[in-house]
Amino acid sequence: MKFIVLVLFCAVAYVSAQAELEPEDTMDYIPTRFRRQERGSIVIQGTKEGKSRPSLDIDYKQRVYDKNGMTGDAYGGLNIRPGQPSRQHAGFEFGKEYKNGFIKGQSEVQRGPGGRLSPYFGINGGFRF
């Protein structure tokens, strides 16, 4: 008797499982998650070189180029030093990643004393081994 009930239960489960596999809707699938928008980042960096005064940079960076291992970021923000008024600056960073190294560069413009613009350019690189 128990064996007959078990076989009957398995048969009902099998038939109901087959009925669930049949497609009820032929409507196309619409994804509910939207692609993320590219966003920038806020970077806070403090530096102190040798016996000079410390400085604090607060920047907003936005990635403007990113293909084949090359990147380009535009940024702008404030440079704060104790005892001096804060200075605005803007610049561009670029870089290229290689299999065993990298090369990066930076250009920046900042208002100097008297309101003049003072440019800054730099380049660096490295090898991994």
UniProtKB/Swiss-Prot annotation:
Q: Which UniProt keywords apply?
A: Antibiotic, Antimicrobial, Cleavage on pair of basic residues, Immunity, Innate immunity, Signal
Q: Which stretches of the sequence are propeptide? A: 18-36
The signal peptide, as residue positions, is: 1-17
Q: Name one GO biological process term.
A: innate immune response
Say what the protein does: This peptide has antibacterial activity.
Indicate what this protein is called per its UniProt record.
Hymenoptaecin
